[in-house]
Swiss-Prot record:
It comes from Maricaulis maris (strain MCS10) (Caulobacter maris). The keyword Nucleotide-binding does not apply. Keywords: Methyltransferase, S-adenosyl-L-methionine, Transferase, Ubiquinone biosynthesis. It is an enzyme of class 2 (transferase). SUPFAM superfamilies: S-adenosyl-L-methionine-dependent methyltransferases. This is Ubiquinone biosynthesis O-methyltransferase. It catalyses: a 3-demethylubiquinol + S-adenosyl-L-methionine = a ubiquinol + S-adenosyl-L-homocysteine + H(+); a 3-(all-trans-polyprenyl)benzene-1,2-diol + S-adenosyl-L-methionine = a 2-methoxy-6-(all-trans-polyprenyl)phenol + S-adenosyl-L-homocysteine + H(+). The gene is ubiG.
């Protein structure tokens, strides 16, 4: 059972209307592995493995459904590509997205899979205004490069992490290599993503995440790079953070 409740129109500081409209136009394609979201489908297994290992290590969890009892928030959840695996691992999952079309797609797919996910059309600021209880884990995946003000957005997101909890971030670095591969290569040459999906000036450096989340009372681990090998058509984790990377932040328990 899923839910989607919020006004049809959102007017919040973090929202970039052009970005919301961009993803609304292709919302129906989220679960098609050969669609415009094909790169996310290829990237998802390595990302999910990293998140599962990170969360299990942090909370001392194991088993087939190790996330039983955890509350996980996926901000900018899109069509639910991460929410559903988190729910299958036992978590109580809340997914929020500024694009109502994304929430509708995610809700329908979760219902078809028999998964209970709390989907909401909205943004992080609304959860704060509604005094939502903080979450054990907040996922901030491929969304900060699409918001109006990444710094303010990240500080707000930190407020939604409970003491002793985690935030896991994933985004694209603002480097010449990222411009060449993630924008020119992926969008203009290979056509893996619609042209204009990413704008170079909106890409986010690890130092920006570190500054914002430290302001939000969190400590940061070193970034982990995610690289694509065109010969094997596979993504892998490594030290190269010049294009895709992930970062883990912890909020002190005290």
């Amino acid at each position: 059972m899923t839910s989607a409740a919020a006004p049809n129109t959102l007017n919040r500081p973090s929202i970039d209307p052009e970005e919301v409209e961009k993803f609304s136009r292709i919302a129906a394609e989220w679960w098609d592995p050969d669609s415009k979201f094909k790169p996310l489908h290829k990237f998802n297994p390595i990302r999910l493995g990293f998140m599962r290992d990170t969360i299990c290590d942090h909370f001392g969890l194991s088993g087939e459904r190790p996330f039983e009892g955890l509350r996980i928030l996926d901000i900018g959840c899109g069509g639910g590509l991460v929410c559903e695996p988190m729910a299958r691992l036992g978590a109580h999952v809340t997914g929020v997205d500024a694009a109502e079309a994304n929430i509708k797609t995610a809700s329908v797919h979760a219902d078809e899979q028999g998964l209970e996910i709390d989907y909401r059309h909205g943004v992080a600021e609304q959860l704060i205004e509604q005094d939502e209880a903080p979450f054990d884990v907040v996922l901030n995946l491929e969304v900060m490069e699409h918001v109006a003000n990444p710094h303010t957005f990240l500080v707000d997101c930190a407020r939604l992490v409970k003491p002793g909890g985690l935030m896991i971030c994933a985004t694209i670095n603002r480097t010449s290599k990222a411009f060449a591969l993630a924008i020119v290569g992926a969008e203009w040459v290979m056509g893996w993503l619609p042209r204009g999906t990413h704008r170079f000036h909106k890409l986010v450096k690890p130092s920006q995440i570190r500054t914002a989340l430290r302001e939000g009372g969190m400590s940061l681990r070193a970034p982990v790079g995610v690289s694509y090998n065109p010969l094997t058509d596979q993504f892998s984790l490594g030290e190269d953070t010049a294009v895709n990377y992930m970062m883990v932040a912890e909020k002190p328990a005290g």
